[in-house]
Every structure is written in C-alpha cells, then in structure tokens.
Amino acid sequence: MEITYILSKYFGSSRSNIYQSNSQQSLTIQNSNVASKKLNVYEFIPYY
C-alpha cells in the first residue's frame, strides 16, 4: 500500500484509482498518460 501511495502522490492520481487497482501493473496503466505528460518536461534537459 505504501508503494501505491507514493506512486499516487508522484503522479497525482486520485485515491479512487488507487483503491480500484489491484496491482501495480493496473496502476501503471492508469497513470501512463499522466506520467508521459509530466516526463515531457525532461525532454528539454540535455543528457550528459
């Protein structure tokens, strides 16, 4: 439950989505769109 709470806090998903998902896989699928939107910011950061 702690892992799903950290993921929900990081990806900013609601608690309803956390309780509905029974595994991290379904949680990742639900947050895939939100994660891609937030990670787009790092595309402008050059890699060294």
Swiss-Prot record:
This is Putative uncharacterized protein DDB_G0291564.
